């Protein structure tokens, strides 16, 4: 684990607050009829005002072109990694906004899901499940506890209590000077040897991590198209994504993005 200095921790808090403020402004601005391109451009303008930079635009991984949006915009059955286009938001859409910034040399990275204009019954259930699963998972984090305790708490609530599904193959991660650092933090316990090798490693005091349940109404499986970034639920069912930045402490954790929990589930009307 990388030990962080007091300044790095303070800078990480500041980066997280840039993410929170961006979500706040978006929640007050989003409307039915806004296109994903307009949403992304608005995010970019907020970043400029807050003097932070997108951690996503231009991001590269093997086999994919550089990511071309300021933020990840994923609608309905798209789980994560959606890019901007001319698609207008419709009444009842579920929009997962994953916002990542670099500010003062540190990363802030948090996602929240909004119903646009009004919420469907399934949308309400998924959003409530996503919010609560994040809270329950965070409550299981404490220095000295194995990371699998996070996954047990999240999976137990989502799959047993809510009867929804955590998508497999996607999870949280360490944050710091770069977007994706170790450790990898799965949302479900490993089902075979080698699936999640860090599951029994303990959380350590001072760890900076982004934890993020990604929940589907109908399946654990996901699909993608060639080298394109977006990832969808395999069966076309609705999904939600919630993510928080936390620092592990001796008696639990400090949630840098705690103010996101004050955001509304339903935003906007017609533009």
Task: Please state what every model-predicted region is.
Residues 1-271:
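Active-site neighborhoods and metal-handling regions in enzymes and metal-associated proteins
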């Amino acid at each position: 684990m990388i030990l962080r200095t007091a300044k790095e921790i303070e800078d990480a808090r500041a980066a997280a607050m840039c993410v929170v403020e961006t979500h706040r402004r978006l929640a007050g601005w989003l409307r039915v009829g806004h296109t994903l391109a307009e949403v992304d451009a608005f995010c970019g303008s907020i970043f400029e005002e807050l003097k932070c930079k997108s951690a996503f635009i231009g991001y590269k991984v093997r086999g994919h072109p550089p990511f071309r949006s300021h933020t990840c915009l994923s609608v309905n059955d798209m789980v994560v990694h959606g890019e901007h286009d001319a698609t207008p938001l419709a009444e009842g859409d579920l929009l997962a906004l994953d916002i990542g910034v670099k500010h003062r040399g540190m990363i802030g990275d948090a996602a929240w899901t909004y119903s646009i204009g009004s919420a469907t019954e399934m949308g309400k259930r998924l959003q409530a499940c996503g919010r609560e699963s994040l809270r329950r998972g965070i409550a299981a984090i404490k220095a000295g506890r194995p990371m699998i305790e996070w996954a047990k708490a999240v999976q137990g609530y989502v799959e047993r209590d809510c009867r929804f599904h955590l998508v497999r193959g996607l999870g949280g991660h360490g944050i710091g000077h770069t977007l994706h650092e170790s450790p990898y933090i799965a949302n479900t316990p490993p089902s075979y040897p080698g699936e999640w090798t860090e599951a029994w490693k303990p959380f350590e005091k001072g760890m900076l991590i982004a934890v993020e349940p990604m929940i589907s109404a109908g399946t654990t499986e996901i699909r993608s198209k060639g080298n394109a970034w977006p990832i969808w639920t395999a069966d076309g069912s609705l999904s939600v994504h919630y993510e928080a930045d936390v620092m592990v402490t001796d008696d639990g954790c400090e949630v840098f993005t705690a103010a996101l929990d004050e955001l509304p589930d339903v935003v906007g009307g017609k533009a």
